[in-house]
């Protein structure tokens, strides 16, 4: 096997190639060190968002329960109003009529108040649903970021493996070529 002479020009070329590989390896390693930290931060944020979602779901359940309760109460009040109307028609005395009329008026006021409360509760429910939907979107975005970072991490690991193999190959070539 004939050995090529190791000239200064050859040394510069080989050293330059090796230095480029080493620099790229260092950059890849630095990025590889950062990605797990980013993923960890995103996973903490994801956990926080999921806790907020659970809290919103609990609030939604409570508001829905309150709406059902108020609607049930509203139905009962409406039935009592209808019941009082029948009794007003049968009132025996002005005093009884006045008493039934006052009771009916209180029931009408209660029904009106309940309808306002139901309306406000439904608005609150819709606002909570919108907040929950935004949180679900945020959850999806964070999960997508985590997925991309993990994919990038795997790609960088493969690149690092390739760079190390390339560096080793170049070292073997130099040893074989120049008989070192």
From Swiss-Prot:
Residues 3-82, 95-179 form a coiled coil. This is Uncharacterized protein aq_1476. Keywords: Coiled coil. It comes from the Bacteria. It comes from Aquifex aeolicus (strain VF5).
């Amino acid at each position: 096997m004939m050995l090529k002479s190791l000239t200064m020009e050859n040394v510069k070329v080989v050293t330059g190639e090796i230095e480029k590989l080493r620099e790229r390896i260092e950059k890849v390693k630095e990025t590889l060190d950062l990605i797990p930290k980013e993923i960890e931060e995103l996973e903490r944020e994801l956990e926080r968002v999921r806790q907020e979602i659970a809290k919103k779901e609990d609030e939604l359940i409570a508001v829905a329960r309150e709406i059902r309760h108020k609607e049930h109460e509203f139905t009962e009040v409406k039935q009592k109003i209808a019941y009082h109307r029948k009794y007003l028609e049968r009132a025996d005395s002005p005093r009884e009529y006045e008493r039934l009329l006052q009771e009916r008026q209180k029931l009408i006021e209660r029904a009106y108040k309940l309808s306002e409360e139901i309306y406000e509760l439904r608005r609150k429910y819709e606002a909570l649903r919108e907040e929950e939907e935004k949180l679900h979107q945020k959850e999806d975005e964070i999960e997508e970021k985590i997925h991309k970072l993990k994919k990038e991490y795997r790609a960088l690991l493969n690149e690092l493996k390739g760079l190390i193999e390339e560096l080793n190959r170049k070292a073997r070539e130099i040893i074989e070529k120049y008989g070192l």
